[in-house]
Amino acid sequence: MKLLSLALATVLALGIQASSYAAGPASTTTSIQQIRNATAKITYGDTVLLVDPMLAAKGAYPGFPDTYRSELRNPTVELPFDVGQVLKDVDAVLLTHTHLDHWDPAAETLIPRQMPMFVQHEADAALLRGKGFADVRILPAHVTFDGVTISRVAAQHGSAAMFQVEPLATMLGSVTGFVFQKTGEPTIYLAGDTVWTGDVRGAIKRYAPDVIVLNTGDARVKGFDTGIIMGVEDTSRVHALAPTAKIVAVHMDAVNHMTVSRADLRRYVREKALQDSVLIPEDGETLNF
C-alpha cells in the first residue's frame, strides 16, 4: 500500500517542499507534484497518475524552430530528482498530446512497456504502440481507472488565426485536457496546452473543479503576438469564473518558447491580490489538497 506517511517521509528526505491547501471535500490523500514543465504526478489515495512525462536531461534537444528564444536547448533545466523517483509508484501515464515537451524520447525509453498509457486518439495510440507499449488506451469521453473517473475536455493549442495557417495548424495539432474525479476527493481539472476557449469555460462550469491546473507559460511562435497556451491574465479569468478553486500554474521555466516565468506570474498574482488562489509550485514541490 502507498501510505501517505511514507510519501511525506520521502519528500522530507529529498528536501522537497510539501504544501497543504484546503480545496473541496476534506482529504489527506489528494496531491499534485510538479515535476518539471507540464509533467506532474496526481495522487488520489493509492492511485498515482503521471501526466505528460518529459524526462530528458537538461539541453538534450534543440530549441523549437520558429519560436521565441529558439537558440536555447530544451529542457532548459534538469529534473528535480532522478527518473526513478519520477516513476516511483506510478499506476498509469496520461498524455494530453505528444509534442516533445510533453512526451519525449527519454520517456519512451524509460517508462515500462506494460504501463497503462492513456492517449487522446488513434494517431497517438499508434505512435506509442509502434514504440512497443502494450497497454495503450484511447480515452473516451469518460472512463474510470482504479476508482478515478477521467473525463476528456477539448483544448485548443493556439488562436483561431493560427489554425488558419499551414503548416502551423498541423504542427499545433490536437490536444486534450482532463478532469479527474473520485468520491470524497477534490475534483481536478487539468486544462493542458490550450488558450482560453468556450470549452475551457464550459468545463469549469460543468465540473466545478476544486483544483484547476493551467499551463501559463504563454509560449510563442514567430509571426503572432498571442500565445499558443495560456498566460498571466488567464489566471484572473479562471479565478473570476471559479473564485473558490485553487489554481495551480505550471509549464514555465523549462522550455525555450515560454515568455512567462514563475517570477513574472508571481508579480502579477501579487498585483491582482490572487496569492490565496493561485499556486505556483517549484519543480519537485508537492501540493496537498
What do these predicted regions represent?
Residues A60-P62, F81-V143, Q156-S159:
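Active-site HxH/HxHxD metal-binding segment of metal-dependent hydrolases
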Residues S5-Q17:
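Bacterial N-terminal signal peptides
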